[in-house]
């Protein structure tokens, strides 16, 4: 499956906001000109139409979670099938992905790093190794770093970085044993206020 392997800062500049694609060890410095889009004429951001705003919002969220278009569309279809607010359900599905939960628990510095950790069989769910990044974590599931992976320096660094992030009410993490439990469904109020999921729903509803 194709993945974007280019500069992470370029994607954040395109969307005009930090997509949290980098570890956070270093702040977005002057080299990452967040106020200007990438390219020769990046300083002049075009005025977007309603469709353009919807498309940019979809691209922003898709890139934030590191998901390709086809898979992202499937999440929308699944969210629209379920009862309740489609936008909130879409974000809940994205947040419940195993790679995202690993990132949220602080076992990886970025979602891309979490994805790699899962694919390389460094993560267990309920005592069983799971190497599927898109696997949906359910309430009550226990996610843990495998014993042989616990000594990896990148995991130790990620745990230290996570101490500076806001704690989430829907997960409970034990940093000593490197395991965590999903206590409840992801809470929209604790997710980025910079996401306007309604624009994504409007785009796909056309």
Swiss-Prot record:
Recorded family membership: Belongs to the universal ribosomal protein uS4 family.
Gene Ontology biological process terms, A to Z: ribosomal small subunit biogenesis; translation
Residues in S4 RNA-binding domain copies: 96-158
Ribosomal protein in keyword set: yes
Known role: One of the primary rRNA binding proteins, it binds directly to 16S rRNA where it nucleates assembly of the body of the 30S subunit. With S5 and S12 plays an important role in translational accuracy.
Record keyword Metal-binding present: no
Gene Ontology molecular function terms on file: rRNA binding; structural constituent of ribosome
Assigned keywords, A-Z: Ribonucleoprotein, Ribosomal protein, RNA-binding, rRNA-binding
Assembly information from the UniProt record: Part of the 30S ribosomal subunit. Contacts protein S5. The interaction surface between S4 and S5 is involved in control of translational fidelity.
Name of the gene this protein is made from: rpsD
Pfam families: Ribosomal_S4, S4
Name this protein carries in UniProt: Small ribosomal subunit protein uS4
A GO CC term assigned to this protein in UniProt: small ribosomal subunit
Domain of life: Bacteria
